[in-house]
Amino acid sequence: MRLFLIVLVGICCQLSAQEIKKVDSDVLFTCYKQGKSGDCVSVGITKAAICVFGINGVFKEKVIDETHTEVTLKNGKKYTLLKEEFEMADTAMHIKLGKDGDPEIMRYAIKCFAVMAKVKQDLESIPTFEEAIYKLQHGAHGRKIFYDLGLENNVDVLEKTPDDITAGIAWTKKHVVFVSNGNMDKYGKKVPLDPMYYGGLRLKP
């Protein structure tokens, strides 16, 4: 009986950790922002994904042991990440907490970034996780970034960014931003969508 209770408590704790928390787009605009690295694509897609699916909802997680975590993407693919890979992503993604930002949201964004690097490493046969992070920060394009989160079944690629996008990204040749309801993220500030952002992605459940 005692063993059963211990197992039950463990299962409940794991389920609690996976509780999906919805986040309003207005919160995401200001919660965290791009730092010194070239993370605009990652910042944009993580905000859009969290807006649609919530914290703990972008992919499923299963903790295997203290050093291994298995994630299952929306497309059904599974990846196993090491604890040190999450730590490496945390160090590499130089995002900053915005004014009145929620650290929990930013931590989940970094976790999404780690998963993106792992997927990119696999899809592009990149030798090391560290190199995959570098390529994610210095060569990722908004038009294809959804593959790195396994969201190809949850996206519409648009030639023009309409004002009615609930959550997505928009781009120019040099920059990518999170967009929602006619507004865009300008380094942690909510501003009206600039017409210079000519293309985009719409994320959907």
Per-segment meaning from a language model:
Residues S16-D65, P162-T172, V179-P205:
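Flexible propeptides and autoinhibitory/regulatory segments associated with cysteine proteases
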Residues V9-C12, A48, Y79, A89:
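Residues in flexible loops and secondary-structure boundaries
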Residues K33, G38, K77-D185, Y197-K204:
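Predominantly the structural core of cysteine protease catalytic domains
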Residues K62-G76:
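Acidic helix-start/capping segments at beta-turn-to-alpha-helix junctions
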Residues M1-Q18:
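Bacterial Sec-dependent N-terminal signal peptides
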